[in-house]
Regions:
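RNA-interacting cores
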Residues: 1-267
Length: 267
C-alpha cells in the first residue's frame, strides 16, 4: 500500500542536505544491510521486503518535500510498499540518528523528533482516482528521463505517465493502468510548459563502476507544468490515476541522486 511519511529532525544549522545525500542516508536505513542476500532475507519477515542496496531500477521509497527552519529539518519519505514504514518506525524507535555529509568528521548528525504518516491509499483506491482533469505539476527536484541509456530531451505528459505506469506495473501489476498510448495521450492532454533546462552534476566517484567521472553532468528540467485533459477521455482517466500515484513515488531516471521528485496538485 503506498504511503507518505513526514519525519522531523533536530538538526544543526547549515545541514548539507542535498537530495543525493538524503537518498543515501535513507538507503542506509531502508535497504538490506550489507552481506545479506535477497534469498537469505526472504526467510525473515522483517527483511524480506527490503531492497538490495545495489539493485538496479527504482527503489520502493523516495524523497519527497523538504522543509527547513533554524533548528528543525523535515523530510517527506514516499513509499510504494508500506511494509517499509515499519522499518522506518523501528529505526525511529532506536533513536532515529541520521548522518549527512561526505562520510567525514564534518558530517551533520540529525536526530529524529517524530515521524507521522501524512497520506496512505490502497492500490484499489488509487485505481479509482480517475476523475481529475487538470493539474499543476511542480518539479520539486531536477527531473530527467532516459530511454535505452539515452537522454530524452522532451518533457510531456506521456513521458511522465510512462514513468509512473512502469512503477505501478512493478509494484502492483494487477491494478496497473495499461501501457501508455502516447498518441492518444497527446491528443487529449494540453500542456503549458513553464520549465527550463539545467545541467546537474552527478558528482560520481571514479570507482562507482559506471564509467563516469566526477565531472559528469546531465541535462534536466526544473520549473512547473500545467496540464489539462478532455473530461471523460480514457487517456485523461489513466493520467488522473497516475497523477494520484505520483504522491507516493518519483519519476524519471537518476532517482538515486534525489532527482525526479514532483508535486502534482489537481486543479
Amino acid at each position: 500500500m503506498p504511503a507518505s511519511v513526514y519525519v522531523s529532525f533536530d538538526a544543526p544549522e547549515g545541514v548539507p542536505a542535498t537530495p543525493r545525500r538524503l537518498h543515501a542516508a535513507l538507503s542506509a536505513i531502508l535497504d538490506l544491510p550489507p552481506g545479506i542476500s535477497p534469498a537469505r532475507a526472504a526467510k525473515f519477515p522483517t527483511l524480506a521486503h527490503r531492497p538490495p542496496h545495489d539493485a538496479g531500477g527504482v527503489k520502493p521509497y523516495s524523497l519527497g518535500e523538504l522543509c527547513h527552519s533554524e533548528s528543525t529539518f523535515g523530510v517527506e519519505v514516499r513509499f510504494l510498499d508500506d511494509r517499509l514504514v515499519d522499518t522506518l518506525d523501528a529505526w525511529l524507535s532506536w533513536g532515529g540518528v541520521m548522518r549527512l555529509g561526505a562520510g567525514t568528521e564534518d558530517d551533520a548528525v540529525l536526530i529524529a523528533r517524530e515521524g507521522q504518516v501524512i497520506a496512505q491509499e490502497s492500490w484499489e483506491e488509487l485505481a479509482q482516482r480517475d476523475k481529475d482533469t487538470a493539474w499543476e505539476v511542480r518539479l520539486v527536484t531536477p527531473t530527467t528521463f532516459s530511454s535505452k541509456g539515452n537522454h530524452v530531451p522532451s518533457l510531456s505528459p506521456a513521458t511522465i505517465a510512462t514513468s509512473l505506469q512502469q512503477r505501478w506495473w512493478t509494484w502492483n501489476r494487477r491494478l496497473a493502468p495499461p501501457r501508455i498510448d502516447r498518441h492518444a495521450m497527446a491528443s487529449v492532454l494540453a500542456t503549458q510548459d513553464f520549465t527550463r533546462s539545467s545541467m546537474v552534476s552527478l558528482a560520481m566517484p571514479r570507482n562507482a563502476g559506471q564509467g563516469r567521472l566526477s565531472s559528469r553532468r546531465i541535462p534536466a528540467h526544473e520549473g512547473h507544468l500545467r496540464i489539462s485533459g478532455i473530461e471523460g477521455a480514457e487517456a485523461t482517466q489513466v493520467f488522473s490515476r497516475l497523477m494520484a500515484l505520483s504522491a507516493y513515488t518519483n519519476v524519471g531516471s537518476h532517482t538515486s541522486f534525489g532527482m525526479g521528485v514532483i508535486d502534482a496538485v489537481a486543479a
